[in-house]
Amino acid sequence: DGAVLAMVGGTDYVRSSYNRATEAVRQPGSAWKLFVYLAALEAGYVPDDRVVDEPVQFGDWRPRNSNGRFAGEIDLRTAFAYSINTVAAQLGNEVGFGTVASMARRFGITTPVSTYPSMVLGTSEVRLIDMTRAFAAVGAGGRSVEPYGITKVTDRDGEVLYQHDARQAYQQGPDYVAG
């Protein structure tokens, strides 16, 4: 439901109140491929679709796999499980880099997202809390999840001063995409 059980935003709040979990931006790397595959599924791909892991080029950019090898023909499920860079690049190109960026925004990414081809490999900087929100939404069957840290505040007499009110979750993608 979005409850944050623990968060470490820094090592010493007195020295620096900057919360790296909610404020800092970092490149998410392969975790970003979630949005590439969600966009592909929404565009009609299915996990058993066959794709080819092979050298590809988009303009001057030639993505490589981390192991330096290519697997040839594989299914999408395997490409996602093994985080195959060339397949993610091909999917992003086919569905559109703007479509991938839109999917990321639908799942809670609030930072600006580039639409350059390399974005499919996580080169756009994002906040950790946004990535957490997105992955939680997938775990919730595609329903939005808003992170929160305080559930209730009472006074010494037990009177409720604040009670977290869960917002109505909305569907961020079709049921078959995240479900």
PLM regions with names:
Residues V4-M7, D12-Y18, W32, T78, ...:
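A penicillin-recognizing enzyme superfamily signal
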Residues Y13-R15, L41-D49, T110-P112, A140-V145:
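Secondary-structure transition/capping motifs at alpha-helix termini
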Residues L5-M7, R50-V52, T78, Q90, ...:
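Structural recognition of the beta-strand scaffold that forms the well-ordered cores
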Residues Y45-V100, S144, R156-G179:
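Conserved catalytic neighborhood of penicillin-recognizing serine enzymes
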Residues A39, A43, Y82, Q90-E94, ...:
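Generic, well-ordered alpha-helical scaffold segments in large soluble proteins
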Residues G2, V25-V51, A79, A134-V138:
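Active-site SXXK
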Residues D12-V14, Y18-S30, S66-N67:
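Short, contiguous acidic/charged loop-to-helix segments that flank catalytic cores in large enzymes
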Residues R62-N65, G96-R133:
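Mid-domain, small-residue-enriched loop/turn segments at the edges of structured enzyme/sensor domains
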